[in-house]
Structure formats: C-alpha cells, structure tokens
Amino acid sequence: MNSQVKVFGFGMPWESLYGYSQAAQVGDTVYVSGQLSHDRHGNFVGTDDFELQVRTTLENLDAVLSQFGAERSQIVETTVLVRNLRENFDTTARLHSEYFGKHRPASTVMGVSDLALPDQLVEIGALVRLDVKA
C-alpha cells in the first residue's frame, strides 16, 4: 500500500528556512510539529508572559487541527517543552487540562534550557488520530 503524505504550513518564513511543515498526515495519523506563540503574520506573541504564550500556542494548535478536519478529542499525545519548568509547571498543567477538558491524551512535559526563539518559553507538539471518534 502506497500512502500519500499531506502537509500543512502557515506560510511562515521559518518553515522554508528550516525545511519543515507544521503538520504531516499519513493515513489517519497527523503529526503536528511543535507549535509556538505567534500571530497570523508570524509576529511572536507574549514576550515574558508564559500564560499568554501557552494560550496562543494552543490556538495555533487548533488552527493546525482545523486544516485536517480534526478536533482536540482526536489528539492522542502531546509533547510540551517548557523553559523554567519548575516555575511554569503549575500554569502548564492548568492550561493543558483546561484546553482538553475531560479528554486525557498521553502527554510528556520536559523542561528545556532553550527553544528556537530567544523569548520563546513553550512549544507544544501533538499526535492526532483522525480515526478516533471526535
């Protein structure tokens, strides 16, 4: 069986610069690259505001999901990278739980020393199964 890969990008310069897509679908699985806090024009959002960065990052995750006709309840796993994890863990946990409601995907949260952008405090990737009932 020969599967096709469907990719999606926001059209941001860094996608070409680093040679990646925001998400790639193979069959019923969508692999979502780490999302970060930016607006529709690629401007970074939330310098020094961890909660705003998480909320904006999750909004960008929703935008990616919509390109594949997916919903949050079809996310089966998240990977959350956080700078200053000890300081930001409670906020991370609260906002992750708020975002998913009663849905409980598998999740890995890791503290990191740096992320791609100097002011970036969080990055969230996801694994989505389109064959999971939404």
What do these predicted ranges mean?
Residues M1-E59, A63-V76, V82-A134:
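N-terminal presequence-like segments and the immediate start of the first folded domain
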